[in-house]
A protein has these predicted regions:
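Hydrophobic helix-coil surface modules that form long, contiguous segments used
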Residues: 90-104, 110-211
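A surface-exposed beta-strand-loop module
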Residues: 2-83, 173-182, 186-187
Length: 211
């Protein structure tokens, strides 16, 4: 839509496996599931029918993809002097909506149109380079694992302040965080009763907060 800027598009999601998870007598079993893909839609064939009146199924999809430089406004990679900014949206498989008017709504995603989505609860873990800040829909559940002691103090101050408090200033952007050893940090977020979830990650982010 916005031009590839010389990037070779690899076709989108690479599906490694699709499995159905079942639990019998406390033991979890993963079974390979057959599936078919048509444009942006996947149909998964369950090994047995889903029971009515409250039946449920857990499906595990192992997939990967390369974020495009230009992602139709919702996703992309921006080059800055302090590092790349990655913005990620519509990046994971979604269930089609089942409603009492049309049944399954299986229209494909259509560019600039709005998406018809179910509400649900999300829990995500995002592993990024240790000098990145990751922002995401919802609530960060492990701030002590990803922010330095000083940043945690500033966040605590911001929760009580009507004025903006800098958590990570422009002068600190190039300073590596000492809060976690190793090359990466994992940020855990959760949100309840939401239509969707998106996130962004960069070493170039300046962060502030207030009550």
């Amino acid at each position: 839509r916005n031009g590839a800027q010389g990037q070779v598009f690899d076709g989108g999601h690479k599906i490694k496996s699709v499995k159905v998870i079942s639990v019998t007598k406390g033991k979890s079993t993963e079974t390979e599931a057959k599936f078919t893909i048509s444009d942006t839609r996947m149909q998964v064939f369950l090994p047995q029918e889903l029971k009515s009146k409250g039946g449920s199924v857990k499906i595990k999809i192992d997939f990967s993809f390369i974020a495009p430089f230009e992602g139709s406004d919702r996703m992309g990679v921006l080059e800055t002097k302090n590092g790349k900014i990655f913005t990620i949206a519509q990046w994971y498989p979604r269930m089609c909506v089942y409603d009492d008017v049309r049944g399954w709504n299986v229209n494909p995603y259509l560019g600039a149109s709005e998406f018809y989505l179910e509400y649900g609860d999300f829990e995500v873990s995002i592993t990024a380079p240790s000098n990145h800040i990751v922002v995401c829909s919802g609530e960060l559940t492990n701030p002590a694992a990803v922010y330095s002691i000083e940043e945690q103090k500033r966040l605590a101050q911001a929760k009580l302040s009507d004025k903006t408090v800098l958590i990570r200033s422009a002068d600190e952007v190039n300073s590596l965080s000492k809060s976690v050893s190793g090359a990466t940090k994992t940020w855990n977020y959760k949100i309840k009763n939401a239509r969707d979830i998106s996130w962004a990650s960069s070493a170039a982010f300046i962060l502030d907060a207030a009550k």
